[in-house]
Amino acid sequence: MVLFGLLNLHLQYQKYGRQMILQERIEILNKLSAYMAGNEPEWAEAKERAARENPWFVPEFIEKAVNSITNSFLDPKLLTNWAAQYHVPDQQSQPKKVGLVMAGNIPLVGFHDFLSVFISGHIAVIKPSSKDEILIKHIVSELIKMDARVSSMVFFAPQLAGLDAYIATGSNNSSRYFDYYFGKFPNIIRRNRTSVAIIDGTETAAELDLLADDMQTYFGLGCRNVTQLFVPTNYDFIPLLTALKKYEYYLDFHKYKHNYDYHLALLIMGNKYYMNNDSLVFAENESPFSPVSQVHYQFYSAPEGLSHLTQNTDIQCIVGHGYIPFGTAQAPSLTDYADGTDTMAFLQTL
């Protein structure tokens, strides 16, 4: 059973004797992949409950997140190569307790952090987001059913203290809190980030269709969602707006429609120029961060003038020709680390 709190952490760790070796950890993750790809009644119920608890987690987004994890993260060959790249030992001689503060903007967004700690052989102490706790808790409970020793490697806690290291993901405001409490320990603290696309005007209809996915998957709430476009002067937006029409059904979701109506009204009352396709608004704005249902854009005259974007710490990834291919922003690999900070390398220093 999943433990809540840290009171029994040390005793629980000792209870099962021999640690899981690396190959056993990879094997159980392969079993987890099969479980997540299936439709066992308990798993189906957990996904349904997660969708009920958080209206932003519609079933199609939960399935997309699950498919991304099973296809890109849990393949045994990928895991073996990933661990070998960092010389992960079979067993940690002195496993460290690593606190994980997880975000909740999209389903299972904190899974990669959990996976990194688990495959490294350290002990994960997780504080899940209240917006996304059902899925991760169910996954861990299933792992424990597969092998009771997992219960000595993964814990849940309402508050994190007295640990060896911390990985915390949140907003710019919460990051100041994290800095204050976790700053004196080894840490990775992540702040607000978003993604942009550079359009050169030669994109095909198929590429624009894929860009629409990069923009609107998960309602645009992920840090890898494109929320700002850089387009050539005199760019014709009509083909892209047309490609985005496949997401008109988002207006059937009241939280999305509320955002759309509200932000459109602000632009109208402010007498601001905008474009829309009746479900998404384009507004010229220098900020890479845009609200749900709105995407910002800026014009450029020369591609060289955009070189600074690769150094912008607000930007998670750049989509476009010569950058991340269209349609792949929401399909990160094991080594696409959030904020560009190598989580596995960090864990190997503990």
Q: Model features per residue range: what roles?
A:
Residues 85-105, 157-162, 172, 280-282, ...:
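Donor nucleotide-activated moiety binding/catalytic core segment of transferases
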Residues 80, 106, 173-175, 237:
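Glycine-rich nucleotide phosphate-binding loop and flanking beta-alpha elements
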